[in-house]
């Protein structure tokens, strides 16, 4: 039995906010309470309200404001000597770094957050930090390094009946199964995540899980309409809650469904829209994936092969710079499918992986970390 989803990142005077609170409401109330805490001279309360402000800005795609807010939250927490609040602020900064495509910085910050949380005896912050490190490695494609950590965090979340992190872990493991071709396992886990999220009233987690189910139905070659219907259901949630990043990824996935169904003109339109959304929030991973879909769609619509080849080379270099190994493999696959051979120096560069090493914190035993 799972409890209702909670939002431990909303703390202090904002503790009554829920996981489904609109981001505009979180930002407005967080800003108001931050001013009140500043008037009262409470640095720890300023740090906790600042955390909510930082997270609202980040989830709305306002990355510069989010960057300023998490750093201010950290400074206030440090001034108050509140190590746990310092951990939460750095966790927010690490999550923002991952969103912006700086995976090395994300690893460093999330590792620091985990250490601070341990020092401050904040087991929830430590759990979130370890989960963030696991997600960063998964997004990068380093499944061997983070697969066990995902499984351990899932087991802990199930044991406690903690819905939000059960959903997160299920979706992460499902994505790894999906990317390694184990579609049946992935589909079962995405569907379980969707059901748990629905029952726990975790609307954000539900929207992401529906997107995962739609992806599997589409990639297996099923009728595209059920996948499109699921994406429409998820989109309604994203729009109602103003989940900017989730909405952009929803649109990119709709492009994927159209592309796999051979509906290249519709796919192009969705990829172009998603590309603009990701650029507007400075999210390079989503931007790169949308660019890849757009290049492939245009190629099928008759674009000049030389231009396609040039675009894929540039995209591959960008993905290599960011360190997104799985996405880079997708470019290699596109080059083969479209008859565009990679240059010799590209193949040679594969011998030198450019992804950051997993910090020691990610290999630590997480038992009890999210209790």
Where are these regions (language model features)?
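Short coil/turn linkers that connect adjacent helices within long alpha-helical scaffolds
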Residues: 20, 38-42, 59, 76-82, ...
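TPR/TPR-like alpha-solenoid signature
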Residues: 10-12, 31, 51, 91, ...
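C-terminal non-catalytic interaction modules
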Residues: 1-25, 32, 280-371
């Amino acid at each position: 039995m799972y409890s209702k989803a909670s939002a431990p990142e909303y703390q202090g005077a904002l503790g009554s906010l829920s996981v489904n609170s609109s981001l505009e409401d979180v930002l407005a109330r967080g800003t108001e309470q931050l001013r009140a805490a500043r008037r009262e001279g409470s640095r720890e309360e300023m740090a906790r309200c600042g955390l909510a402000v930082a997270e609202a800005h980040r989830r709305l795609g306002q990355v510069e404001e989010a960057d300023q807010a998490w750093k201010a939250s950290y400074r206030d927490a440090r001034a108050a000597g509140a190590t746990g609040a310092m951990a939460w602020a750095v966790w927010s900064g690490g999550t923002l770094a991952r969103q912006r495509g700086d995976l090395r910085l994300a690893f460093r910050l999330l590792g620091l957050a985990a250490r601070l949380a341990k020092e401050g005896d904040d087991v929830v912050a430590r759990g979130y930090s370890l989960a963030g490190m696991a997600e960063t490695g998964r997004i990068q494609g380093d499944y061997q390094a983070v697969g066990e950590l995902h499984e351990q965090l899932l087991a802990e979340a199930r044991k406690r009946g903690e819905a939000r992190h059960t959903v997160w872990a299920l979706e992460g493991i499902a994505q790894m199964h999906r990317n390694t071709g184990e579609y049946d396992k992935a589909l079962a886990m995405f569907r379980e995540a969707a059901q748990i999220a629905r029952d726990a009233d975790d609307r954000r987690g539900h929207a992401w899980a529906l997107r995962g189910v739609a992806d599997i139905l589409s990639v297996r070659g099923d009728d595209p309409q059920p996948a499109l219907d699921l994406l429409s259901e998820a989109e309604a949630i994203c729009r109602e809650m103003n989940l900017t990043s989730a909405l952009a990824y929803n649109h990119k996935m709709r492009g994927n469904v159209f592309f796999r169904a051979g509906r290249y003109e519709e796919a192009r339109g969705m990829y172009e829209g998603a590309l603009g959304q990701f650029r507007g929030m400075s999210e390079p991973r989503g931007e790169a994936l949308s660019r890849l879909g757009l290049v492939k769609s245009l190629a099928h619509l008759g674009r000049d092969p030389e231009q396609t080849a040039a675009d894929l080379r540039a995209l591959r270099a960008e993905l290599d710079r960011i360190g997104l190994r799985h996405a880079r493999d997708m470019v290699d696959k596109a080059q083969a499918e479209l008859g565009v051979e990679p240059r010799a120096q590209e193949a040679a560069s594969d011998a030198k992986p450019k992804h950051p090493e997993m910090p020691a914190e990610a290999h630590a035993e997480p038992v009890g970390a999210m209790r």
